[in-house]
Amino acid sequence: QWQGGIINSWFPDLPENDASRGYFLGAQILNLLAPKSSQQTVEVPVSLEIGERKTENGITDRKAIVRQTRAALEKINENNPDRIVTLGGECSVSVPPFTYLAAKYPDNTAIIWMDAHPDINLPGDEYTGYHAMALTACLGIGDEEIVRLLPGKVSADKTLLVGLRTWE
């Protein structure tokens, strides 16, 4: 998923729509670089269509985020995995897998969030990209509709932030 990130300002030489899809390209590169595995691979389809990038309830592209969260959870639930490795997109692609695992293993799920940013923004904060709200969503905090979709949540005392360089 790429809609959770608002990164076009980082690439002023690219047309806005092309820059916005940067996370999708990164996901494709990760897929090429990742070692092949005998484990099942499941891909969540992601639309590359760019419509009007609208902010709703404090989240840019909120409708796409809700749609893709549902699609990811549907794929996860169809396969009922015991473990999940997620490659691609921006930080919020981790929300469905982490919350699924939190529901499956309620007493044995912890998150080590390795990122330059804590991703603990909330809807209504100045920055409206959902990728900056990913960890709070895993904690069960944030947009009510999105949080209701999520099968579980991880307790804040079972969360470790690693690699922070800025507190955004």
Predicted segments, located by residue:
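Conserved alpha-helical scaffold segments that buttress catalytic/binding sites
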Residues: 1-168
